[in-house]
């Protein structure tokens, strides 16, 4: 799902898949965000959490002794975010809930 917001200067689009911006345009229609080109990089502005990049052997050690596999660029960029609320003239808020099928990568979640 894609949500659009605008004011007198800008319009933006936010995609619920990955919770990422997909467009930033000025009032004249000039696009400021990379729109993706499969020849180079089809992505746009991914949310990279809790890491940016790769881990050695794709492993993270949590709490000193708990080892989990963590994909490149973290766990959020390929997940569906839930729209909590929106006033499309001002803001929209997306939530991402813990997925029980995925390991817990950090201990302070939700505190």
Language-model region placement:
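Surface-exposed acidic/polar loop and edge beta-strand patches at domain peripheries
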Residues: 1-110
């Amino acid at each position: 799902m894609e949500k659009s917001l605008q004011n007198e200067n800008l319009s933006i689009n936010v995609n619920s898949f990955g919770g990422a911006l997909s467009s930033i345009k000025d009032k004249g229609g000039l696009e400021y965000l990379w729109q993706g080109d499969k020849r180079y990089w089809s992505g746009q502005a991914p949310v990279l959490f809790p890491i940016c990049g790769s881990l050695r052997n794709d492993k993270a050690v949590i709490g000193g002794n708990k080892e989990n596999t963590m994909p490149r660029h973290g766990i959020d960029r390929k997940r569906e975010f839930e729209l909590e609320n929106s006033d499309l003239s001002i803001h929209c808020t997306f939530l991402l809930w813990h997925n029980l099928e995925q390991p817990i990568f950090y201990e302070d979640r939700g505190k």
